[in-house]
Amino acid sequence: MYFHSTAIILFLNKIDLFEIKITHTNITVAFPDYEGPRERDCALEYIRVQFISLNNNKNRKIYQHVTSATDTARIQVVIDMLFDIIISASLKMVGV
């Protein structure tokens, strides 16, 4: 099981569209168990918790980012974080 301890990066992209759609479409269309309000932050937290609850390895790191690909500053932060993860994992593999 090679991927058992591999870090996961959860990208919740197109947040700008999500903010618009959540006011018009109930999130229960995709998540029937959701009982919270039609608010961005509440819905995002629910989605994050649902995703994280599927993780069977509590030592696995899960990085979560809410993004809009058109927001170049935010995307740069995410890219920088990805480089940090890759470098850290590479150093760990060689024992540094």
From Swiss-Prot:
Region (G1 motif) residue spans: 9-16
Annotated residues for binding of GTP: 13-16, 69
Keywords: GTP-binding, Nucleotide-binding, Transducer
Residue intervals of the G-alpha domain: 2-96
Gene3D superfamilies linked to this entry: P-loop containing nucleotide triphosphate hydrolases
Tissue: Expressed in ASJ neurons.
GO terms for biological process, alphabetical: G protein-coupled receptor signaling pathway
Chain intervals for the UniProt region annotation (G2 motif): 67-72
Keyword GTP-binding: yes
Role according to the record: Guanine nucleotide-binding proteins (G proteins) are involved as modulators or transducers in various transmembrane signaling systems. Plays a role in innate immunity and maintaining survival in response to metabolites of E.coli. This might be by regulating the expression and signaling of genes such as lys-8, ins-7 and daf-28. Has a role in lifespan to promote longevity.
Protein's name in the database: Guanine nucleotide-binding protein alpha-9 subunit
Gene this chain is encoded by: gpa-9
